[in-house]
Amino acid sequence: MVTAAAIKEFAHQLGFHRVGIVDLRTYTDDHPSGVAALQRWLAQGFQGEMAWMANPRRQKIQAVLPGAKSVISVALNYYQPDPQPPPKVKIARYAWGRDYHRVLGKRLQVLGQWLQSQVPEMDYRWYVDTGPVQDKVWAEQAGIGWIGKHSNVISRQYGSWILLGELITTLELTGDRPHTNHCGTCTRCLAACPTGAIVEPYVVDANRCIAYHTIESRAPELPAAIAAHLEGWVAGCDICQEVCPWNQRFAQPTDVEDFAARSPLLQTSLEELATLSDAAWDELTRGSALRRIKSAQWRRNAQAVLSSNPYD
């Protein structure tokens, strides 16, 4: 039988920076960020148009994989210092390089295949922000880090500049100790959010969030309350992470070459994005997580920045 230690060793060999395990046999959903918190968040309509967040399978891991016994949570540090020349537009740091779904997904696929070669009868599913799974909860419970007041997972080693994935398996594995919270009395992220999207510690209202509106919303126009406070952001927003003391102190450049600041979007001007054609969109977003933002939304976002709060 393959051990938890052997799994972690192999996962680290694949390049994952953090690996932890949750033993579902002993897991109890009584922590602040669990199912009850998700239900309260949904009841308040804080998911906006993200209907998939209400998928009932998200509230029970065994509905995702019948017979699930363990969750292997993994993380990759994606932090990159500001590139030179400086970007012409503000884009969330996670999207500066290649699509993280593919970068983590390839590694998780290999991990799953290796596990099955060790234990052929076991079953598994892996996800990278792609299924009805509470990624952050499992990362916290696996000891990867803790869910910060800005709702991102913070690790002692890398701050919150980490991308998460998980492999759910029917294997019975020894779990790790859940991570304790180290936000303390700090409220810098709440104070810094220009739209007040962090309505209380650990609770983000997507309806007020710049990242949500610039990436997920398909509305023809951004709400006035969002457009007036974009502060240059055309795709995502890192404000709450940039002010976090853990990030300011512990951020370190990633060794993952795929996360290097290579996206041509970084050197595309607001004026170009404001008139972006479908053909140019196809070229600029190829291989990027920001392909999720369609050409009409890029034009909408850039036009809103230009008309409200230009970023030079």
UniProtKB/Swiss-Prot annotation:
[4Fe-4S] cluster 2 binds at residues 193, 209, 237, 240. Its main location: cytoplasm. The active site is at residue 129. The keyword S-adenosyl-L-methionine does not apply. The keyword Transferase does not apply. It comes from the Bacteria. Its cofactor is cob(II)alamin; [4Fe-4S] cluster. It catalyses: epoxyqueuosine(34) in tRNA + AH2 = queuosine(34) in tRNA + A + H2O. Its EC number is 1.17.99.6. Residues 176-203 form the 4Fe-4S ferredoxin-type domain. GO terms for molecular function: 4 iron, 4 sulfur cluster binding; epoxyqueuosine reductase activity; metal ion binding. Pfam families: Fer4_16, QueG_DUF1730. HAMAP family: QueG. Belongs to the QueG family. Monomer. This is Epoxyqueuosine reductase.
